[in-house]
Amino acid sequence: MSLKKSPFFELRSGSVDTLLFTVKTTDLDALRAELVKRFEATPEFFADDVVAIDVRRLADGERVALADIRQMLNDVRMRPVGVVALATQGWAGEAGLPLLEARDRRAPAAKPADEAEPAAVPAVETAAAPAAAAAPEQSSDPAPTLVQAGGQTLVIDRPLRSGQQIYAKGDLVVLAPVSHGAEIIAEGNIHIYAPLRGRALAGVHGNHDARIFCTCLEPELISIAGIYRTTENPLPADVLGKSVQIRLEEEKLMIEPLRLT
């Protein structure tokens, strides 16, 4: 075969980042139900994102119907491109998807210089909400406001009205109120130095180390890495309307008062 370089195409070694969808159960009905619950409130977050199905967490001898999982992911608008499996999981190559190699990488937590210390009081612990958040109020705006920043901190210094949406690829700092029906989304941390009455979603591409900091917590929805809580599960009095930080601990949202003075 000729090794002459072609002016029309090039083949070379490379790597592409994808999300890993880690399968931890063989109960596909339970898996489907959990997918629906996670995505029904925020279906656009992973829309058209490529994903690799990771079956390495399954116990020895366990196997799943990868074709069914592939369809589940398509149903929530994700695009499966391959399977990550152990050498002993030979069945993983039978679904028509290529076998991929993966190096697990956990996104590092951002450490703001002026991050406030949490008060030494018990945290509020909550799991994912059992139902989707209520639909946002109607707005006279013709379309949501969408702002993107290429991995750097995005600062918003104007009030956000119902129907407006902000998306930051890094951290997001908001210096004005977030009204009911407004939505702020970040792949990193979110800092809100004003009342939060709409939705705040941090770490939306799976960053479990992301946090939300807020000086007045009155939200419709809060979420980190897909784990969310809505107003259907009322907040305790010691954090409602107060300054707080929100973080993940073992797949649960922890809401902790902040000591700012």
From Swiss-Prot:
InterPro entries per UniProt: CAP/MinC_C, MinC, MinC_C_sf, MinC_N, Septum_form_inhib_MinC_C
Pfam families: MinC_C (PF03775), MinC_N (PF05209)
One GO process term, biological-process aspect: division septum assembly
Annotated Low complexity bias: 118-144
Region listing for Disordered, in residue ranges: 106-144
Domain of life: Bacteria
Keywords: Cell cycle, Cell division, Septation
SUPFAM superfamilies, per the entry: Cell-division inhibitor MinC, C-terminal domain (SSF63848)
Record-linked HAMAP family: MinC (MF_00267)
Function of the molecule: Cell division inhibitor that blocks the formation of polar Z ring septums. Rapidly oscillates between the poles of the cell to destabilize FtsZ filaments that have formed before they mature into polar Z rings. Prevents FtsZ polymerization.
Quaternary structure annotation from Swiss-Prot or TrEMBL: Interacts with MinD and FtsZ.
NCBIfam families: minC
PANTHER family according to UniProt: SEPTUM SITE-DETERMINING PROTEIN MINC
Family: Belongs to the MinC family.
Protein name as catalogued: Probable septum site-determining protein MinC
Gene encoding the protein: minC
